[in-house]
Regions:
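Short Pro/Gly-enriched beta-strand edge/turn motifs at strand-loop
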Residues: 2, 47, 192-193
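Hydrophobic, small-residue-rich alpha-helical packing segments that form membrane-like cores
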Residues: 15, 20, 28-89
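Secondary-structure boundary elements
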Residues: 21-26, 66-71, 99-104, 214-218
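Alpha-helix capping and helix-loop boundary segments enriched in small/acidic/polar residues
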Residues: 7, 52-56, 125-126
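Outer membrane beta-barrel
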Residues: 1-37, 138-161, 431
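Exposed, low-structure sequence patches enriched in small/polar residues
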Residues: 78-103, 107-459
Length: 459
């Protein structure tokens, strides 16, 4: 049995009880408890990126069965979620199978979600929201090479471009407690992690392919390709009907800008020198994404886009059994703004691009140097700079924050053992998206201050 209690000021807190029963090849898990999530959204008033204004309290209970059968592992799960404040109830079910074979492994998962909202004493009718999701992945090993591929098709709650980001009124959205399958390659570099793409469980079709293999006895190569889009291509009306949207279904990722496409190509080389005391990792990354579909009519096509090119480098030197030094450098070039095309009946279309920044290209640099002693002590110095910071364009930016386009920090940490670590930090952090273990969360900027972190793992 397990009792869990955790509450965070600006994330997700939970209290609950978990029980597990094992017998032969079967495992049953039962959970029950409540979850409180806090987010900040522009849909509601009093928006402040550092202060939550949207609160959701849920009571959950469910069970999961896992069974080893015919050299495979099959599983089924259901989860019931109640939200009293919003008079909402959700039912989630899942079926999955994991089957290893001689030269690889296959995994498949299907999920369904039903959301019902009670109208209470009002005459408002709330339709039942039904959503589904499918995910499959396959890994194959050929001599020293491996290839992994996956396909996902999530349609938990598909909404048109005018309402898709309204987390308050879209009561059929995927829940915060739902987690998407992790990507094959998780970026360990600062700038690349910040530009990672989160899987949209509500509406996304995607594929991923990764190829890994040796180039020599000391060097390896990794090729990663990701492509995803909305499950629909969206079209807007004209004139008085400009706010009305329609869509055509996509069953494979689309490159059409009206489908919120995302595409990433990442190539990495890594390995050791002949003496084995120097490890290197260097790569190239290209990303393209359409964030918003503003208009896609016979008159005007307008999209918010982002392109980035990143060069990451990491070198680790083992000086002796006690000391090692690591150097990390990232160079990034970003283009973000609005692409607009005004269509003409005479064939002379007007194309334009409006940058979201004062410059056409944002240039980011991140440099970090760390030293480790005896696997106990670590010392870190980092510096990040840009020629234009998009956060400074927000009129609600707190005036107490430094408007300089650079962030520097120094930290020292001591590891008492594998479960106890103490860190003292001074300086600034730019903030942004941070993805670890397949979960992404937004880190708020930290400006010229002191932070003390103590982490403890309790078995």
């Amino acid at each position: 049995n397990q009792l869990n209690y955790q509450n965070l000021d600006f994330d997700t807190g939970s209290r609950g009880l978990g029980m597990q029963f094992d017998k032969d090849s079967a495992v049953i898990n039962i959970i029950m408890g409540d979850v409180s999530s806090r987010t900040s959204t522009t849909v509601l008033g009093n928006f402040d990126p550092r202060v939550p204004n949207h609160f959701v309290d849920e009571f959950i209970y469910g069970a999961d069965l896992s069974l080893d059968i015919l050299k495979s592992t099959a599983g089924a799960a259901f989860l019931l979620v109640d939200e009293k404040e919003r008079s909402l109830s959700h039912v989630l079910t899942n079926f999955r199978i994991d089957r290893p074979y001689e030269s690889g492994e296959f995994f498949m998962s299907i999920v369904s979600k039903t959301s019902e909202k009670d109208n209470g004493m009002t005459e408002i009718f709330y339709e039942t929201k039904d959503g589904v999701g499918f995910y499959a992945s396959s890994s194959s090993y050929i001599k020293n090479w491996s290839i992994t591929s996956s396909y996902r098709n999530f349609k938990i709650d598909v909404n048109n471009p005018a309402t898709r980001d309204n987390i308050v009124h879209n009561y059929g959205n995927a829940l915060n407690i739902q987690r998407s399958p992790s990507g094959f390659y998780e970026h360990t570099f600062r700038l690349l992690s910040r530009s990672s793409k989160e899987v949209n469980l509500n509406d996304e079709v995607g594929i991923e392919i990764q190829l890994l293999g040796p180039l020599s006895s000391n060097g390896n190569i990794a090729l990663n390709y990701i492509k995803s889009s909305s499950s629909k291509q969206w079209y807007s009306g004209e004139g008085p009907l400009a706010g009305q949207w329609s869509g055509d279904n996509n069953f494979i990722p689309s490159s059409s800008q009206s489908s919120y496409p995302f595409e990433e190509v990442f190539v990495e080389f890594n390995g050791y020198n002949s003496n084995g005391n120097i490890f290197y990792k260097v790569g190239l990354d290209f990303q393209y994404e359409v964030f918003n579909v503003l208009s896609n009519s016979a008159e005007v096509k307008s999209y918010e886009i982002k392109e980035s090119f990143t060069f990451p480098l990491l070198v680790n030197f083992n000086l002796n059994p006690l000391w090692n030094i690591e150097l990390q450098l990232e160079l990034q070039k970003v283009k973000t703004g609005f692409e607009t095309t005004i269509l003409s009946d005479f064939g002379d279309n007007n194309h334009s691009f409006t940058s979201l920044l004062p410059v056409k290209y944002q240039k980011n640099i991140f440099l970090a140097l760390s030293t480790n002693y005896n696997q106990k002590w670590s010392f870190n110095v980092s510096h990040e700079s840009t020629n234009s910071d998009e956060l400074l364009l927000d009129s609600g930016q707190d005036e107490s924050f430094d408007s300089a386009n650079d962030w520097s920090s120094i930290s020292m940490a001591y590891k008492f053992d594998s479960d106890h670590t103490l860190e003292l930090f001074y300086g600034s952090i730019r903030g942004g998206l941070d993805c670890t273990n397949g979960v992404c969360r937004y880190i708020q900027a930290f400006d010229d201050g002191i932070r003390i972190d103590y982490s403890l793992n309790i078995d």
